[in-house]
Amino acid sequence: MGQNLVSLLPPESLYHGNVTMTQQNTPKIAVIGFGEAGSCLCQGWGRSDIRAFDIKQIGDTDIAADKTRQMKDAGVIIGDDAASTVREAYMIFSTVTADQAHAAASAVAAGIGQGAYFFDLNSCAPSTKQKNAAIITKAGGRYVDVAVMATITPK
C-alpha cells in the first residue's frame, strides 16, 4: 500500500517496445474517461504531461464545453480521440463508465503501443473485461484488471 504504480514495474519494463519516454524516464500516462475518477487521478499525480480524452468533450454542446474546461483546469493535455491520446503512453488508465468500457478498450486498441499497460478501472461484467483483455492483448498491449474498492477522491 502507498506505492505508486511506476515503482511496481520492473526497471527493464520501462524501456520495452516502441513506447516513448519523457526526459526524466518517467512513463507517459494517458487517461481515458475524465469523470470523477479520471480527474481525481490526474489531479493527484500533479503532473503536466498527462494526456486525457473523454467522449463527452466531443461536439458543440454545453456538456462538451464544460468537460473541456474541466480538463484544462486540471492541466492535462487534451487528446482529440482515444487512439491518438494513448499513442505514446506507457500506462493507460480507463476510467469510463461500465457501459462504455468495451467501446473505450476498442478505441484504445487502435493506438496502443507495443507493451503498453492498459489499466481497466471499470466495474463492468467479467465477460466484458475478458473481451477487453482480448482486444488490448491482440493490439500488443498488456491488460490489467484493477479492482477499485472505494471512491477515488482528490488529495
How does the language model describe each region?
Residues 39, 43-47, 106, 110, ...:
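Short, well-ordered alpha-helices that flank and scaffold nucleotide-derived cofactor binding pockets
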Residues 55, 123, 148-149:
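Short, ordered loop/turn segments at secondary-structure junctions
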Residues 76-112, 116-117, 121-124:
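Rossmann-like NAD(P)-binding element
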Residues 52, 80, 120, 144-145:
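Hydrophobic residues in well-ordered beta-strands that form the structural core
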